Amino acid sequence: MTKQEQKFRERRVADRRSSSHKAIKELVQTRTEMLASYGKLASHQPFAQDGEVGVLLQKFCEALIDYTASAHFQLYRFIELEKERRGSVRQAAEQNYGKIVMTTKSILDFNDRYEDESALEEPDRLKTDLSGLGEIIARRIELEDKLIKELTASR
């Protein structure tokens, strides 16, 4: 391999790494916003049918969907499109992607149930559902962090 070819190859690798780091940064940002929104909503227990809880719930649902979409489109799609060539990253993605998809279904179900403020008519159910969702989000974050660890590891 000539020096010019080597430099070109190194530049392509650097570009791919830059793309993956950007995707990670965006994922972590949307995750942080979602977790902050979750905390604000959860701190308003016991839940009551008032405007404040409804607004917090809607903001949380929006942040939750933004986070879920960011994870899919920024991180997993990056790997799916085979822009990532490291075997350890691809292996981590294969081991965890199916589990992450299952959490996505639960997230979407929660959003569908609570996108309408009439769901506040059952505050005890919201408390239970929010607690269960918190566990699902924690599991999802663990799985994503495994992927992030591989993406940020040096060769």
Language model regions located:
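Surface-exposed peri-terminal alpha-helical interaction modules
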Residues: 1-155
